[in-house]
Amino acid sequence: MKIVIDHHGSNTMYGDINYINPVAPACCQILIGMFKYFDIKITKNIATCLMTGIITDTCGFCFNATSETFEFAASVVRLGVDVSEIFRYTLQTKNKANFELHKKAYDRMEFLEDGKVAFTYITLEDEIEVGAKPGDHEGIVEVGKNIENVEVSIFLHPVGDKGYKISLRSLEYVNVANIALSLGGGGHNKAAGAFVTGTPEQIKQRALREVRKQLK
């Protein structure tokens, strides 16, 4: 039996039992409710794991955090969990390979559609050259979105030699979940992704065709 717990509204209900809550900012926040329902005690270790999931999914409480999110964070602090340490370890601490990989992506960044779209990518060769570890690309797509006047940030990173993961972020009005769905993926209105094949240029053009349908 396959049980699916998810907070993505684009979930296709592929499990035998599906618990989908697209309002929840993180799967870990769904688990908190389940633990309470089944009267499972949330220990300090469990709270640390749940808080790690919430911090990474909300990018440090920046996206979709609710009052319940902050109430749980307060309870975690009362248990003695060092939330600032989780934040530093997951979102702030960088190694040299991470820095070099990000630098390559920023050097390639293009601003398209009158500056409303930021696009960049890294290659498998880039990862090998700098000695990157899994996850060293995290955060690149957010930087593109944070540039003034950018509405949509598009970032590609390799999935071995099979293709690319396209990550999409939007600032205000573009629904990137719909764009990801058109590419075979899914996600949230302002954060989504998909696995795609082709060259970075080919993938860029496919994504731009969908983005243009929503740009104002």
Residue ranges and their predicted role:
Residues 56-182, 187-216:
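Hydrophobic helix-and-loop "lid/oligomerization" segment in the mid-to-C-terminal part
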